Amino acid sequence: EPITTGLKTYPSVLNKKGTYTQSSQLTITESEVGSSKIYCEVRRGESVWIKEIPDCKGDKVHPTVILTQSSSEEITSRRFATVLCSIIDFHPESITVSWLKDGQHMESGFVTSPTCGVNGTFSATSRLTVPAREWFTNKVYTCQVSHQGVTQSRNITGSQVPCSCNDPVIKLLPPSIEQVLLEATVTLNCIVSNAPYGVNVSWTQEQKSLKSEIAVQPGEDADSVISTVNISTQAWLSGAEFYCVVNHQDLPTPLRASIHKEEVKDLREPSVSILLSPAEDVSAQRFLSLTCLVRGFSPREIFVKWTINDKSVNPGNYKNTEVMAENDNSSYFIYSLLSIAAEEWASGASYSCVVGHEAIPLKIINRTVNKSSGKPSFVNISLALLDTVNSCQ
């Protein structure tokens, strides 16, 4: 007898191979399931195809329950263990799945998803996630399945092998000196090494939560997490304390680390000079070097870069040494080497060594030299040039 209610047939769809696909959907009530056989009949011309629809309602069938777990190597590397409880071939659909740890019911950490099989029975999976540190404490985990008055339990024991999972380590990085001197906001970085799965990283300033961003595993190792927060430059310069807080269910208490701008009592302004190749070398070589010597400054935070005709030079085209202490250990120096083509020098281009340091009255100074200048000239960089340097980074 043809069915006329609860039926929805969708338009034919042209496939890439030039054939068509058509779908038909039948909706019935739960009470109608199993009351009679249902067939899908397809006619095309004189051809007829008939397919019986499987019935998900039938005799009572209790499930088969199987437990599997991830390997110890995977648990150590991913920082969590996965236990899969497979509940296979049961009928009717209604089941209850519970997880126990050492005989105590667990309230969270697992997800259960039932599905209907094509053979008229149901199957389901329940996935339990356990932090690695907890897994390696030899606890017993139980998947308990109740179906039609019958309860089945399957146990699995965590590894007795000690976990090689070290405690998380927090490393805080201050903003770059270039950010501090040139921008209205600066970025603080919190690097969490040995980060467990599901770690939460947040920032606070004197009990006030700050909006931050987190990136997973961009650090030096696969188990690191980096969280960044943007604050005003003024707040950083004020010496305020900023806290990175690491939370995880595996930690007895949250881990905290703080950072602030250190107060500098001995500010020393740097001297800047450019060292040129000897005149005879310039005429004899295709390339020549400009060396910028910056010395006598304190504290050690500084940036040095170059411009050609007031346009920033790509950092890959010059080389800065590490900041080094001078003989008295109370001040520092740094070299920057720029290689240029002799033809460019001969054309009259102007080369500037741009230096930023908090002891400089205008925060930035430069030395400029070109073929016709005779000797390097010292210039306090103007606000207009400051904007140019900043925009060309």
From Swiss-Prot:
The keyword Transit peptide does not apply. It comes from the Eukaryota. Residues 63-157, 168-260, 270-370 form the Ig-like domain. Keywords: Glycoprotein, Immunoglobulin domain, Repeat. The keyword Repeat applies. CDD domains: IgC1, IgC1_CH3_IgAGD_CH4_IgAEM. InterPro entries: Ig-like_dom, Ig-like_dom_sf, Ig-like_fold, Ig/MHC_CS, Ig_C1-set, Immune_Resp_Modulators. Glycans are attached at N119, N155, N200, N230, N329, N366, N370, N380. SMART domains: IGc1 (SM00407). This is Ig heavy chain C region. It comes from Heterodontus francisci.
